[in-house]
A protein has these predicted regions:
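Accessory nucleic-acid engagement/destabilization modules that flank
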Residues: 2-159
Length: 159
């Protein structure tokens, strides 16, 4: 597979001097999340949370921050935005809250509404994902509907 000319990174150099690419990070977190699934029916939806959680790190602002410690740019909202655009509200909650904790629904909708207005940044993230050959085929709500009762769904959102 062809490699991107620009290396999008998720994490700066560790103690061994190695950076972690965005694609590698997202795919490894997706696999880790899949392993946390309590049942096979939940594996797909857990995996999508892992894929989406750091998508905002593809933005130019975040890439500048991670390389030079310039102004920090929030990133969690962009994966949640993708989930919401695909009508996966229950995936949006854990994705947007993976650093700051779960927002209430109104706060999340307000934040994601701001994403919708920031067309330039959204296009930048999409373009970066394409350049990095990082494609996400979204699941549908049927994956979430396999989670049996309301208590299991609540546990998923808070996991």
């Amino acid at each position: 597979m062809k490699q991107s000319k620009y290396k999008y990174i998720a994490h700066s150099e560790n103690s061994n001097g190695a950076e972690q690419s965005m694609k590698q990070h997202s795919e490894s977190v997706a696999e880790l999340m899949r392993s946390f699934a309590l049942a096979d029916d939940f594996a797909e939806i857990y995996s999508y949370c892992g894929l989406l959680h750091d998508i905002g790190k593809y933005s130019k602002g975040f890439q500048n921050y991670i390389r030079s410690r310039e102004e920090k740019e929030p990133h969690a909202k962009w994966g949640a935005y993708i989930a919401l655009m695909n009508k996966l509200v229950n995936i949006a909650f854990p994705v947007i809250g993976h650093h700051a904790g779960l927002p209430n629904r109104d706060a999340m909708v307000e934040t994601l509404g701001l994403c919708a207005k920031d067309e330039n940044r959204w296009k930048n993230i999409q373009q970066a994902m394409e350049e990095d050959y990082f494609i996400i085929s979204m699941c549908d709500n049927s994956s979430f509907n396999k989670i049996g009762n309301v208590f299991q769904k609540e546990l998923f959102v808070r996991l």
